[in-house]
Amino acid sequence: MERSLAITALGALAQTTRLETFRTLVRHEPKGVPAGELARMLDVPQNTMSAHLATLSRAGLVTSERQSRSIIYRADLDGLRELTLFLLKDCCGGSTELCAPLIAELTPCCASEVEKS
């Protein structure tokens, strides 16, 4: 990930509603959430939510897909992965024992899904 895109992504997440929107979308993967439902869930006017979703989309953190009359939004997990890797690149000066606790914290969220595959 380029530094400028990382700055854009971090800037997009540096706002309360956008951060909560992104976290909500991550929790609802892979199904996604319609825009109107997101607005209701977070008690935000629909036009405001639309602007926040556009910002997250431009930052490479959210994707959308039209399904019938709704637009379904999803967290872009590839974008999240790239941002996380950008932040952790060259972690701990190459001392794997220092990074091990961090890796262990990140692994449990998806371990059961990986085991099912």
Which ranges hold each PLM region?
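Amphipathic alpha-helical dimerization/coiled-coil segments
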Residues: M1-L5, V26-R27, L77, R81-S117
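N-terminal helix-turn-helix DNA-binding core of bacterial DNA-binding proteins
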Residues: S4-P45, I71-G79
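Alpha-helical residues within the helix-turn-helix
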Residues: R40, S57-R58
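Beta-hairpin "wing" of winged helix-turn-helix
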Residues: R58-Q67, R74
